[in-house]
């Protein structure tokens, strides 16, 4: 049985003080959660948030990282730096990173491998645009991403991997995939992983849904056979809303 994982992607929001206040309010609200609870602050807030959640059941994720260990990469953060801070997860390949920062599948494959090398669990994002959904190429688009992004991993790594399916057209738009659409696509992603690494490993890979997840949508989503959690955007910025999702 796969343990659900619900992660809150704060994107470019919250100062250090606001971030600490947020997790201090969140801690008592999610202390009895049956799923893994993850918050994803900005780089500048990671250390303060990590310290603030110490001793609680809340894990911390970075929103990105570089695949090189060090060097002349101005503005970037190395995986070893995150590992030294005790960061648990890293979100990789979010559609905003792919679109605005031209992240390629080749670079993401390097990042996924490097995260595992540094004992950080990747939350790898994949998804299609509205145009791709409407012209029936959803699975083809996602398969190209998955095949490139998770190539060359060990079965053990694949079993630890978290994948987040986020239809790009449902992010921040208020539109959501129907629960059935989300589940069917996630089932297809699991089949892609199985084709590469066998069904035993694919059955252990946790696959989240991301895309305008709200307190009033989560319960039905989590009742679907293949949805193992959520990557939450806007609703994760409000402690009560995020807690309501975590405690679905």
UniProtKB/Swiss-Prot annotation:
Broadest EC class assigned to this enzyme: isomerase
Domain of life from the UniProt record: Bacteria
SUPFAM superfamilies with a match to the protein in the record: Triosephosphate isomerase (TIM) (SSF51351)
UniProt KW Cytoplasm keyword: yes
UniProt KW keywords: Cytoplasm, Gluconeogenesis, Glycolysis, Isomerase
Active site per database record: 94 (electrophile), 166 (proton acceptor)
Main location: cytoplasm
Subcellular location: Cytoplasm
Family indicated by similarity: Belongs to the triosephosphate isomerase family.
Entry protein name: Triosephosphate isomerase
């Amino acid at each position: 049985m796969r343990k659900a994982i619900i992660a809150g992607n704060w994107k470019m929001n919250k100062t250090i003080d606001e971030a600490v206040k947020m997790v201090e309010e969140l801690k008592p609200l999610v202390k009895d959660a049956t799923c893994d609870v993850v918050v994803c602050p900005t780089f500048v807030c990671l250390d303060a948030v990590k310290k603030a959640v110490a001793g609680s059941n809340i894990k911390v994720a970075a929103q990105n990282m570089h695949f090189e260990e060090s060097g002349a990469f101005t503005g970037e953060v190395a995986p070893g730096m995150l590992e030294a801070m005790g960061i648990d997860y890293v979100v990789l390949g979010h559609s905003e990173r792919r679109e605005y920062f031209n992240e390629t599948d080749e670079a993401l494959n390097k990042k996924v491998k490097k995260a595992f090398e540094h004992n950080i669990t990747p939350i790898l994002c994949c998804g299609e645009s509205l145009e791709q959904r409407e012209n029936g190429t959803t699975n083809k688009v996602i398969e190209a991403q998955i095949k490139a992004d998770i190539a060359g991993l060990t079965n053990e790594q694949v079993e630890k991997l978290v994948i987040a399916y986020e239809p790009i057209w449902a992010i921040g738009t208020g539109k959501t995939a129907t629960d059935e659409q989300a589940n069917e696509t996630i089932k297809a992603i699991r089949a892609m992983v199985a084709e590469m690494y066998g069904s035993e490993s694919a059955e252990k890979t946790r696959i989240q849904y991301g895309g305008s997840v709200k307190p009033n949508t989560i319960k039905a989503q989590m009742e679907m056979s293949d949805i193992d959690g959520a990557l939450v955007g806007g609703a994760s910025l409000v402690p009560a809303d995020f807690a309501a999702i975590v405690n679905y």
